[in-house]
Regions:
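Extracytoplasmic
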Residues: 1-158, 180, 202
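Active-site-proximal, structured, solvent-exposed surfaces of multi-pass membrane proteins
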Residues: 8, 19, 65, 109, ...
Length: 276
């Protein structure tokens, strides 16, 4: 579950948030959020959801279940206030105090789900156009930018499919799946080439689904899917940092030993003399 909050306090409260500050946006996420907001380009270091994006189907794909807003909307923006009131009519208030209100987005998709149909698209933009206009139901069909090497099969009863996130860390996600037929596990997580997938310990391709998300083909039955962030540049950076730290420690110790020896040697050669 993620939240969409009205200020930058999500990290302090332990909330996952689709907005934020980052000087190095992932291009796909930037394009996705721009499409979500009706074409408004993102600030070069901020990612924001504007009022036009609150009703976008693309927001549901990001697992945004709760929207945190000020208790009283701005009185200066008459059009925005009216638009927000319409939004409130379909998003019930689940918490309210004098300063904050929490609205529930019941259309939000889960963190992980299974589909048994895939449609090939030529680009991220094509996928976002289809999803933004509700021409494709992402709960049923994944939009992929390449043909999956695995065969998908329609399930007689997809309602029995289950995808349970059993482990979630910054660099690793584990999902237990159960499906009546082969399908695609879709995760509401941003795709990046350094993410690697393993199905029951065996390597599996990671596909870009719906212009942004990660997806992995799964066989029928019960399986464990692991996604790990395995970046060779990250490993190289860590290795260089470790070597540099060891070298710095060694140089510091060496300099200290030389200084100590020099001090001891100087004392041994020091003599005193007295006048007759």
């Amino acid at each position: 579950m993620r939240a969409l909050e009205a200020n930058g306090r999500a990290m302090l409260l332990g909330l996952q948030n689709v907005q934020g500050y980052n000087p190095t946006h992932i291009a796909r996420y930037d394009e996705y959020m721009s499409a979500l907001n009706g074409g408004y380009e993102q600030n070069y270091h901020f990612i924001d959801v504007f009022k036009d994006g609150l009703d976008s189907p693309l927001l549901d794909l990001l697992n945004v279940r709760y929207i945190i807003v000020p208790a009283q909307p701005s009185q200066e923006d008459t059009e925005g206030t009216q638009q927000f009131k319409q939004f409130e009519s379909t998003h019930p208030t689940v918490y309210e105090d004098g300063q904050t209100r929490v609205l529930e987005n019941r259309a939000a998709l889960p963190r992980a789900w299974i589909v048994h149909s895939a449609q090939r698209v030529g680009s991220e933009k094509e996928a976002l156009d289809l999803l933004s206009t509700s021409q494709v139901d992402p709960k049923q069909t994944a939009l992929l930018e390449e043909e999956p090497s695995e065969e998908l099969s329609q399930s007689d009863d997809a309602s029995t499919d289950e995808a349970e996130v059993t482990e979630y860390e910054a660099n690793q996600v584990q999902v237990k799946t159960s499906a009546e037929a082969p399908g695609l596990l879709v995760l509401s997580e941003v795709y990046y080439p350094s993410w690697k997938a393993y199905v029951d310990g065996r390597p599996a391709p990671v596909y870009v689904a719906d212009g942004l998300l990660r997806s992995v083909a799964i066989p029928a039955g019960e399986h464990v899917v692991e996604l790990r962030y395995e970046s060779w540049t990250l490993r190289m950076g860590i290795a260089i940092s470790v070597v540099a730290c060891v070298a710095l420690i060694a140089l510091t110790i060496s300099a200290g030993v030389r200084h100590w020896r020099k001090g001891v040697g100087g004392k041994k050669h020091t003599t005193t003399s007295t006048s007759p």
